[in-house]
C-alpha cells in the first residue's frame, strides 16, 4: 500500500520546488483562473511557517495590507505556483513565527541574513 502511495506522490511532486526558509520575505507568483482567462497574481510577504511533509507540504505567507494582517496558505507542490522569489532572506531562530501576529510596527521586523561571498 505504501509503495502505491509513494508512486502517486512522486508523480504529483513539483520538478524543482522553490528553496526558501521561514523568515524570508518572498514574492509568490500564483496563477488564478477566472473563467477562460488565466493570470498571475503576486503575493509578497513573510514566510511564517511550513507545515506537513511530502506532497501535502504547505507554507504560510503573512503581509500587512492597509494596516490589517493578512495570511495566505500555499501548497508547496501546487502546479498553480508559477515561481517563488526570495526578496530578502531573514535571520530567525524559530521554526514557526506565530508571535509576529501580535507584534506591531518595528517589533514585527525580521533581521536580514547576511551571507559571506567566497572570493
Curated annotation (Swiss-Prot):
GO MF term list:
structural constituent of ribosome
One CC-aspect GO term: cytosolic large ribosomal subunit
Keyword Ribosomal protein part of the UniProt annotation: yes
Residues forming coiled coils: none
Keyword annotations? Ribonucleoprotein, Ribosomal protein
Example of a GO biological process term: translation
Gene3D superfamilies, from UniProt? Answer: 2.30.30.790
* SUPFAM superfamilies the UniProt entry points to: Translation proteins SH3-like domain
Q: What does this protein do?
A: This protein is located at the 30S-50S ribosomal subunit interface and may play a role in the structure and function of the aminoacyl-tRNA binding site.
Xref: NCBIfam families:
rplS_bact
Family (UniProt): Belongs to the bacterial ribosomal protein bL19 family.
Annotated protein name in UniProt: Large ribosomal subunit protein bL19
- Which organism encodes this protein? Treponema denticola (strain ATCC 35405 / DSM 14222 / CIP 103919 / JCM 8153 / KCTC 15104)
Q: Which gene encodes it?
A: rplS
Amino acid at each position: 500500500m505504501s509503495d502505491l502511495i509513494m508512486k502517486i506522490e512522486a508523480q504529483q511532486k513539483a520538478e524543482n520546488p522553490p528553496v526558501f526558509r521561514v523568515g524570508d520575505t518572498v514574492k509568490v507568483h500564483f496563477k488564478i483562473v477566472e473563467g477562460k482567462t488565466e493570470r498571475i497574481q503576486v503575493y509578497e510577504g513573510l514566510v511564517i511557517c511550513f507545515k506537513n511533509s511530502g506532497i501535502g507540504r504547505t507554507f504560510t505567507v503573512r503581509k500587512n495590507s492597509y494596516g490589517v494582517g493578512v495570511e495566505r496558505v500555499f501548497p508547496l507542490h501546487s502546479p498553480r505556483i508559477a515561481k517563488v522569489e526570495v526578496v530578502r532572506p531573514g535571520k530567525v531562530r524559530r521554526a514557526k513565527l506565530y508571535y509576529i501576529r501580535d507584534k506591531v510596527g518595528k517589533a514585527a521586523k525580521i533581521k536580514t541574513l547576511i551571507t559571506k561571498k567566497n572570493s
